[in-house]
Amino acid sequence: MAIIPWKAIDESLSLRWKIIVTLLAIYTLRIIGTRITTTRARRKFREQHGCAPVTCQLPLKDPFFGIDFILKLMRVFKEKRLLETFANDFYKTVGITFLVERGSQQTIFTIDPENIKTVLALKFKDYGLAFRAPLFNPVTGGGMFVSDGEEWAHSRALMRPTFARDQVADLALTNRHVTDLVSKIPINTTFNLQELLFDFTMDTGTEFLFGESTDTLCNPTKASQEFTKAFDFTLKDVAYQARLGPLRRFQGSRSKALEVYQVCRSYVERYVDQAMALRTSTLTGEVTRENEPQNRHDSLLRQLARSGVSKEKIRAELLSVLIAARDTTSNLLGNLFFVLARRPDIWTKIRDEVKHLDTNEPTYEQLRHLTYAKYCINESLRLHPPVPSNGRMAYRDTILPHGGGPNGDHPIHVPKGSMVNYTVYAMHRRKDLYGQDAEEFRPERWESLRPSWFFLPFNGGPRICLGQQYAITESLLVIMRFAQEFTSIQSMDAKPWTEEIALGCGNANGVYVSFQKLK
C-alpha cells in the first residue's frame, strides 16, 4: 500500500485553498464592482430625472430588518385596525408618500393620485406583479393576475370578449340568481346577509365563467358544496401566505392546504374537460356550431376553449377570475347594505327611484338610469373598497413624480426591486380630495364629483378591472330588486364596521339585519 507523503497532502490542500480563496476574492470583487457601477448609474439616473431624497421616512428602531415595523403591522392586523392605522397614523403623521427602508429593501407607501397614476399607467411597463406568483401559482397554475408582459397581454385579450357590453347587458342569468337570493331572505328575522351574498356571487360567478352554476343558494350538489368550502379556505390561506411574506419558508408541511387547492382545481377541470371534448368534436365535424349545445350566456370557458389555448391555461384563467370576482362583489354589496340598514333615509330615496319600474326584469339601460343607486355604490366603494390596498414591484430603476424635496413635490427615485404600495382605503378618505365630511357616507357628493385617479376601487390603467361594469350592474340589479321587495332594512348589530382583510375586505362581524315588506 502506497503511503502519500504529508508534504504532498499539504501542497494539495494548499492548492485547494488557494483556488477557493481566489474564487472568493473574484466573487467579492465582482459584487463590489457591480455595486459601485450600480451606485454610479443610479446617481446619474437621479440627476437626469431631477430626483430628490424622499421627504418622509418612517423611523424604525430596527433599520436592518424592520422587526418593530413588522410586529406593529401584525398587532394592528390582529386587532383589525390595519387600514385605520395606515389612514390615521402613518399617512397623516408621516406623509402621503413615505419610505420604509429595511436594510437594502425599500418600500414606498403612497396615497398621492399622481404617483399611483404613474405606477398604473404612465410607467406601466416599469412595474409588475412577479411577487404574486409564489402565492397564486399553487392554486391557479398561472393566469392573468400573476403574469406580466406579452403573457399578460395575451390573457387580457382572451378575457375581454366575456366582459364586453353585450355580455354584461344580458341580465337574464344574473336576475335568475337574484330571484333565488330574494327567496332566501326571511322577513322580520335577524340573519347574516353577508353569508347569502357570498353564496349568491358564487352562483352567478360560476355560471358566468363556467356556463354552469354551483347553485349554492337553492340546490347545491355535494361536489359544489365541497368546492365552495375549499374555495373559501383557499382565499383565506392565500391571504395568510401573503401576510407571512419571507417567513413562508419556515412553515411546516403544507400538504393539507395543497390538498384543498387540488379540490378547487379538480372541480374546475371537470368543466374544462367537457369544453375541450366539445371543441374536439367540433373540429372533427361530429358537432357543428349550429347544433352545438346553446346557453343563453356565452361563458368564459366556452370562449377560451374555442380560442385553442391549452387545458392548463383555461383552468388557470377561470380560477384567477373567480378568485378576483367572488368576494369583490359580495363585499361590495355587504358593505353597502351594512350602511343602508343604518340609514333609512337613504333606503327611502332608493325605493323612490326604483318605484317607477313596473318590472322585476329590467333592461340594462333601465339599470344605468338608477342614478342615486349608483351614487350609493360609489360611496360604498369609496369608504369601504373591497380591495383596500395594492402594490407593484419596480422591474427597473424608475421614478415617481412626487415625494421628494423639502415640500414633497420633487420626483423620487424608485430603485429596481423596490415595492410601491398604495392604500386606496386611505386615499378615499383624504379630506383635501373629498371635503371635510370625507369620513361620512353621503351619496349626494357624487352629483358634482367626477371620479379621477383619486377614486380607484377597480384599479386603473391597462390593468383596470375587466369586470368593473359587470360588478356594478350586478349590484344595481340586487339593489333594485331588494328595493322593490322590501320596505325597510333594520340593522340588528350595533357594532361599528370593522375590517376583515383577506384577499378582499368586508365587515368582520358580518351584516346582521332584518328585512320588512308590505303584507
Curated annotation (Swiss-Prot):
Stored InterPro entries: Cyt_P450 (IPR001128), Cyt_P450_CS (IPR017972), Cyt_P450_E_CYP52_ascomycetes (IPR002974), Cyt_P450_E_CYP52_fungi (IPR047146), Cyt_P450_E_grp-II (IPR002402), Cyt_P450_sf (IPR036396)
Pathway: Secondary metabolite biosynthesis
Cofactor: heme
Gene Ontology cellular component terms for the protein in this record: membrane
Subcellular localization: Membrane
SUPFAM superfamilies per record: Cytochrome P450
Source organism, top-level taxon: Eukaryota
A UniProt-annotated Pfam family: p450
Topological relation to the membrane, as annotated: Single-pass membrane protein
Keyword Iron on entry: yes
GO molecular-function terms, A-Z: heme binding; iron ion binding; oxidoreductase activity, acting on paired donors, with incorporation or reduction of molecular oxygen, reduced flavin or flavoprotein as one donor, and incorporation of one atom of oxygen
Keywords: Heme, Iron, Membrane, Metal-binding, Monooxygenase, Oxidoreductase, Transmembrane, Transmembrane helix
Residue stretches spanning the membrane: 12-34
PANTHER family, per the entry: P450, PUTATIVE (EUROFUNG)-RELATED
Function: Cytochrome P450 monooxygenase; part of the gene cluster that mediates the biosynthesis of the gamma-pyrones fusapyrone (FPY) and deoxyfusapyrone (dFPY). FPY is an undecaketide and thus likely synthesized by the polyketide synthase FPY1 from acetyl-CoA functioning as starter unit and the addition of 10 malonyl-CoA extender units by successive Claisen-condensations.
Family indicated by similarity: Belongs to the cytochrome P450 family.
Entry protein name: Cytochrome P450 monooxygenase FPY7
Gene name in the database record: FPY7
